[in-house]
Amino acid sequence: MEKVLLKLTELFEKAPNLVLTATRRKRYWVRVNRLTSLRRLGAGVFVALAWLVLGPYRVVMAESMTATELLSRALELTRGTSSYSELVMRIQRPDWNRSSTIVAWTRGQDEALIRFTAPAKDAGNAVLKKGEKMWTFAPALKRSIRLPSSMMSQSWGGSDFSYNDLSRSDELLRFYDLSVVETAVEDGHTIYTIDAVPHDDAPVVWGKETMVVRDDYVMLSQTYFDQSMTPIKRLETQRVAELGGRTIGVLMRMSNLEEPQEWTEIEYVEADFDADVADRKFTLFSLTSGR
C-alpha cells in the first residue's frame, strides 16, 4: 500500500503541468495526507480514492484558463503558425445540392488564401484575407475585387457561410466580452459554454454568440444570435478525429436555423498545421495567378 502511495506521489512530482496553481497543489497534498491516514483500507477502496484524486486533474489545464484563453486556443487549433488544408464543401438545399473541393493556406489569424479546385465551373475562384481586408477573384472576370464592408455579410460560394465568417478570425477576442456560463462533463471531457457579448461600439452584426468548447479546445458548436437574441444560424462539429497530428473537428455543419433543410458542411480531407507557406502566397499576384 505504501509503495502505491509513493508512486502516486512521484507521479505528481514528475508531472507538475497537471497542477498549475499553488492552490491546486495544496489541495492535492491534503488529499494525499488523507489517503495516508487511510492506508489500512482495502486495496479496492484505495484505488477508488486514488482515482478521485487523479480524475479532476485530467482537465486542470483547461479549468485554470479564462474564457478568452479557451477560445483563443480553440481558434488556433486548426490554424497553427501556418497551415495547408484540403477540404470538401457540400451545400444542401430542398431542391438541389452541390459538392466542391477547396484548398486553403493560412498564417496566424490575419492571413488566409482559399481557392476552389472543383467542379470545373468554380475552379480558380478564390478569396484572399490580409488583416481587415479581403479580396475575391473569379477567373471569368480576370481581376480581383476588394470586398467593401457592405458585402461581407453576403454568401460565400452560395453556401451558408458568409465572407464575414471567413474574415473574422480573432474578432471574438477583440470586440466581445467573453465569459464561461456553464460547464459539464460528457464522454470524459469537460465541456465549456462561453457567451460572447459584443462591446457597445463593436463593428459586428450579431447580438451575441455562444460557443461550446471541449477541454482539448475542440469547438463543438457556435450559435449566432441577432440583436433581439433570436438564434439565426449554428456551426456544429459533426465528427472529431486526429488529422495532421492534432485532434480537431474534421466535419462541421453550418445550419440556417430559420430553414432547417438548408445547411453547408465543410470536411477536412488533408491538413498540415506546420506547413512552410511562402510570403508570396498571401499576395494579390498569388490570388489571381493561382501560384
Where do the model's predicted regions map?
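N-terminal, post-signal-peptide region of Sec/Tat-exported proteins
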Residues: 85-113, 117-120
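Extended lipid/amphipathic-ligand handling interfaces
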Residues: 74, 102-106, 236-242
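Bacterial N-terminal signal peptides that target proteins for export
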Residues: 25-46
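Flexible, processing/modification-adjacent segments and terminal tails
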Residues: 63-84, 88, 97-98, 123-126, ...
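One face of beta-strands
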Residues: 83, 87, 112-114, 209, ...
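C-terminal segment of classical bacterial N-terminal signal peptides
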Residues: 51-59
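Gly/Pro-enriched, hydrophobic low-complexity segments
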Residues: 146, 167-169, 189-283
